[in-house]
Amino acid sequence: MIFQYARYICTLLIFCCSSIVFSQDSFIRGKLLDVQTGEPIVFATIRVKDRAKGVISNQDGSFRIPTRFKELGDMLVISSMGYQKKEIPITGLSPEYINIIRLAPGILDLSEAVVTAQKKRKLSARRIVRKAIANIKRNYPLNTFSTIGYYRDYQLKQGNYVNLNEAVLEVFDQGFSRIDSATTKVRIYDYKRNTDFEQDTLADDPYDYKRLLKIVDNAYLDSYGGNEFSILRVHDAVRNYKVGSYSFVDQLDTDLLKNHSFSRDNDTYLNGEALYTIKFRKRHPHYSAFGILYISYGDFAVHKMEYTLYDDRKRLPDRKLNKHQGRGQLIFEITTEYQRHDYGKMFLNYISFENSFILWEPPKFKVENSTIGLMKSPSGGIGGFRLELTFNRHPNTDEARDVGNYLVRYKGKRLKIKTAGLVKNEKKVFLLPDMTQKERKEILEGIFEAMKKKINLNNLFSIEIEPIFDLEGKNRLHEWKKRDYDQFREYFVQQVKPSTKLPNDGKFMDKNKPIFEGQAMVRPEDFEEYWMNTPLK
């Protein structure tokens, strides 16, 4: 006879060697640091010279290159916004240690562009952005091309990588004149769940707004069936400039200028090309949004776009400030960088999408079932009853025996409890009601009648339990625990094929299904030319 209880309470380069040694020598590992500050250089491009292949540095500035390029005597070309471009012989890098490479911030040399700069100095920030939007069709490919790159998604929990999933993908894009989500195809070369890092099955589930178990607070993020790469693609506002992308950029060609205020900042350069730096922001009663655009002096091509949105209704703890000197908590941050190809067109170099999310962890301590135990009288008949609660863990002894922690009702009327005790060697508590003989008889008759008519005993009894702890004192009864995570999805291009054809066979990724669950995988003959830039553990 089981009934449920009814309550939830709820460039200068310097090579140094670190002390870390790796036994695996299939990759040369490096880390990029700012020579002045010692801070990691994030999302720098590391290319193998004349091979059009490379990687992008990780959040900690780390990267890895297959040792075969060292055997071939190749050079690495390192470039990053605002730093001097540098070439490094791979033969000078250690295969055993993390190679620390320090880069010096670049100095913008306007000697060759001074005339152009003087002519364009009077351009307002808003006018520069307007020209950049108008020139998208001219600056980006309109015909089919593909990129091959390293994709990963993961979460950060207290600064540590969790649920790291990695893949090598080829993305067949039919050009900026076509709708990306409807026409782009993706072929998976390889994918894996990296079990060298912590796995958290709850955090790895798709977003769940129906049960509110995993959500972006005060925002909505379509789960796309759990396909994180599909989520990433739709958040490239430049590629999707004619459709909605994310608040408050929305549809870039019609809404970016309308929704934001703009200002010019100090110009910079990348690979010798002078770039305007345009800052913009959105003011809203509940949100703050900040963005930066890096736009070419010459053809107004967008080289890079950064966008960060904060929820000003949720404050950072301990009076901390976010990187824009506000107190709002991060909702999402997106960074997209395009690079100019030899043909003059701009192709994706990388895209990174970070969002915070809330995960509600189910209670670890709960009541599994409630039963009624019939008690014999000295004469052998039924002389009484007791209520029995079975827990999934041993409850705290003192709290379990405190009758004040239980509120029992029979047919809506409170039933006083005389004694609460523990059943020996079981995770069970019994409750003895304090009743008159008349009340006992009436309730027993009600129980027998319900059994006879197969009536659910929930219609007779309800039990509310205060949030007692388990025996270890770590888990409160039926308490859902809120956990805050940062989710990342990132795609780093290793090779661009500026002119290609869509393969005839249909072995493409299902965009509405998780990448890492039974997707078709195709490995080309040159598969070994590509690799996963796994973060340092």
For the regions a language model picked out, list residue spans one by one:
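A short, solvent-exposed loop/turn motif at the edges and junctions
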Residues: V48-D50, M75-I88
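Short Pro-Gly-centered beta-turn/loop motif in secreted/extracellular proteins
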Residues: G38-V42, R64-G73
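Extended beta-strand-rich segments in extracellular/periplasmic secretory proteins, especially
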Residues: N135, R239-S296, A301-T308
